[in-house]
Regions:
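Bacterial Sec-dependent N-terminal signal peptides
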Residues: 1-23
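Low-complexity, acidic/polar, glycine-enriched regions of mature
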Residues: 20-196
Length: 196
């Protein structure tokens, strides 16, 4: 009986080790979320969100295949380098930041699509609207150990969303019919994560 209990305990321990998750935290000092949108049909305006948080869970420390990803952005941290424009973007014409202060990416999974390349599919919530989204992701130079003995990895993720899908409904147009602000928003995320 004691031998049986010992075997069962060993199997349970092995099982727990096998399913242990490795957790990685976003390093906000080395991460940025940038966006770009066409203005008046003749140029582009870009900006970024400066406050964010996130984490990744992997099956081990050597691969991000099938990793689980969550991300949260503070809408009020929007910065286009023009204060009046930033305030307009926080208004109900765009993000309604007072009512919807967070954007989130949840239930997202990385799937390998090539050497150092992934697809990230998940649920993006902006202004209370949740839609499926897919990012193209490049892993930058694998996994490294920094000079302070921390394990790090870096990624660049990109996608395009239609802002009207998320009720970002500002729709002023020129007399010619060209929108003042285009529908498509290009998003680029440069993210650095540190193993916990």
């Amino acid at each position: 009986m004691k031998k049986l209990l010992s075997i069962m305990a060993t199997l349970l321990l092995i099982s727990n080790i096998s399913f242990a998750q490795v957790k990685w935290s976003v390093d906000p000092a080395h991460t940025n979320v940038r966006f770009e949108v066409n203005h008046l049909g003749i140029s582009f305006v870009d900006g970024e969100f400066t406050k964010l948080d996130g984490n990744i869970e992997t099956k081990d420390s050597t691969s991000f295949e099938n990793a689980k990803v969550e991300f949260e952005i503070d809408v009020n941290s929007i910065n286009t380098r023009v204060e009046a424009r930033d305030q307009h973007l926080k208004s109900d014409d765009f993000f309604s930041a007072e009512k919807f202060p967070k954007m989130t990416l949840k239930n997202a999974t990385l799937k390998k699509s090539g050497k150092g390349k992934y697809k990230l599919a998940g649920e993006l919530t902006i202004k209370g609207v949740t839609k499926p989204v897919s990012f193209n992701v490049i892993q930058n130079n694998g996994i490294i150990t920094d000079p302070w003995s921390k394990t790090r990895a870096g990624f660049t993720a990109s996608t395009v969303i239609n802002r009207f899908d998320y009720n970002i409904s500002y729709d002023d147009k020129l007399p010619s019919g060209v929108p003042a602000v285009a529908a498509d928003i290009e998003i680029t995320v440069n993210v650095e994560v540190v193993k916990n």
